[in-house]
C-alpha cells in the first residue's frame, strides 16, 4: 500500500486538494470532507519513447519545464494547478489540435479507490494494453471515481516553428477548413487567431492559404482565456455575447461566467449513477462534486 493510499484510507468523506485553480468546477465539496494532498514529482521520463511518469501533485509548471528541456510538450493545459487536477478536470490545452486530446494522452493512471486500494489501469504503451478504457473514465471525472496518485502521459516534440497570426475579417469556420492542420483556431467574436506549427515551409504554405480569406498579421500568442470552460455546438456561437473565446473545431469556449448545467436525459442519469455506485458505493470521494 502506498503512503497516499494510507492517507486516503477507507472510510469517511475525502477530497484531494491541488492548486485550487479549478476548485469552482463541478460543485462545492462537502465541508466535512477531509482534505489530502497527492504526492508530487516527475518519476521517470524517456524522451525517446515520448512518455513521462508523473505524480498527481506535481505542478503543470514543473512538468512543462522538464519536457521543454528535452524539446517536448504534452496535452495538459498550462493554466496553473497540478497534473492530477488537470487530468480529473479533463480540460484540453487550447492548442489541442496540435498537441492532441487529453483522453488519448493519458496512457496509464494509478488511483486510490473508495475502499482505499491502489488501482492501476492502462500502460506505458498503447499496444497490448488491457484496461486502456479506465484512464478515459478517470479523465474528467472530477475525482468522483478515484483519487489519482500517478499518471503516464504521452509527450510529443515541440515543432521547429510556431507562429500565431490574427485576422479581423476572416470567418473562423472558413479558416478552420482552409488550413490543413492548424494547432489552434480561436475566435473572440471580432478577431480570429490561428496557431500554425511545423517546419518553416509548412508554416509558410499554411499562411499563404489564409491570405485569400482575410488580412493577417503576426501576434505574440493566444487570446487571454476567461476562467470558465463551456461546451457548445457551432450554431450556438451566432448568438454569443459578452466576453468569450471559442476554440473552433473543438466545441469548447471560455467565458467569464460558468455554464449552466444542462438537463440530462434519464438514460444519462441512470448510466452515471450506476457508474458512480460501482466505483464509489458509499459516496466518500469528493462528495458534492459531479462531472455532469
Regions found by a protein language model. Give the residues of each.
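Short beta-strand
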Residues: 16, 76, 183-189, 244-248
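N-terminal accessory segments
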Residues: 1-23, 261-266, 290
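Terminal amphipathic helices with adjacent charged low-complexity linkers/tails
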Residues: 195-208, 212-217
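N-terminal glycine-rich flavin-associated loop
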Residues: 1-16, 36-79, 91-124, 160-167
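Conserved glycine-rich FAD pyrophosphate-binding loop
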Residues: 25-29, 189, 209-292
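Helix N-cap motif at beta-to-alpha junctions
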Residues: 168-171, 196-204, 233-237, 258-260
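FAD-binding subdomain of flavoenzyme oxidoreductases
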Residues: 83-183, 191-192
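Short acidic-glycine loop/turn motifs at beta-strand connectors
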Residues: 29-30, 47-48, 113-117, 188-190, ...
